[in-house]
Amino acid sequence: MVSTPARMPGFVILTTLISTGLFHSIPVSFRPMSFIKPPKTLLRQVGRAIIDFNMIREGDRVLLGLSGGKDSLSLLHILHHFQRHAPIHFELAAMTVDPMAGDFDPSPMIPYLKSLGVEYHYRKEPIMDMAKKHMGKPSYCSFCSRIKRGIMYSTAREHKFNVIALAQHLDDLAESFLMSAFHGGKLKTMKAHYINDDGDLRIIRPLVYARERQTRAFSEASELPVIPDSCPACFSMPTQRQHMKELLADEEQLNKTLFKSLLTTLKPLMSEGKPE
């Protein structure tokens, strides 16, 4: 095993994966190079979601799933901002699972998280090779998602995190709702806050009131180091989700209050199973 230095006051541990597959840790200064303040509207929406669904509590240790995309990077900065200004204390770390697919390269996240003073865990797994052996092509994305989630759960347990934060937004929930209704015959969507099956981790989605166009605008205006999605499975075929995205975009052209109405529709569904 690789020994890790003890935590020191004013320091956090940046965890990265080396070629042997073992972790090593580097103490880095907790003081970030600079703070990026997210837009007030995003802060207000996320703050409201956190309150409405009781997502983050005093003393929580939160592990953020960081893909390097615009949504997870936006949520990183929002939670980072709340760490400094919220009336409660919570700890924040981030994790990237590299599925070893296409040209995906999360290495820019390492110095970036270091500059923010955020503890970072990076793990590399041949998920695409596993999917090719065990799944049909249309199932790659769901298989990858399940494996990544399992890796995040095990990492959270190992490092004593009790909350996992995911970056799905209102557009994602609306698309999931239509997919479930059209293809599954059920009225359901992603939950805003729930407990995993083992009962030891809470999973939260603080962006459930926010739109995708907001995270895109924030990431572009702030020049966040977005890593393009380069998974070949995601681009080799049209997906049900992409079809729903296009359907919603067409409908929103005709109905500008579409997502306001959808949020009213979805709120009881996303509230199911909310922990007290």
Locate each region found by the language model:
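Short amphipathic, helix-prone segments within low-complexity/disordered or flexible regions
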Residues: 2-12, 17, 28
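Residue-level detector of flexible, active-site-proximal loop/helix-junction positions
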Residues: 99-101, 127-129, 194-197, 210, ...
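ATP-dependent adenylation/nucleotidyltransferase module used to activate substrates
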Residues: 31-179, 183, 213-221, 273
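Catalytic subdomain that performs nucleotidyl-dependent activation
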Residues: 92, 172-250
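An accessory alpha-helical subdomain
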Residues: 243, 247-269
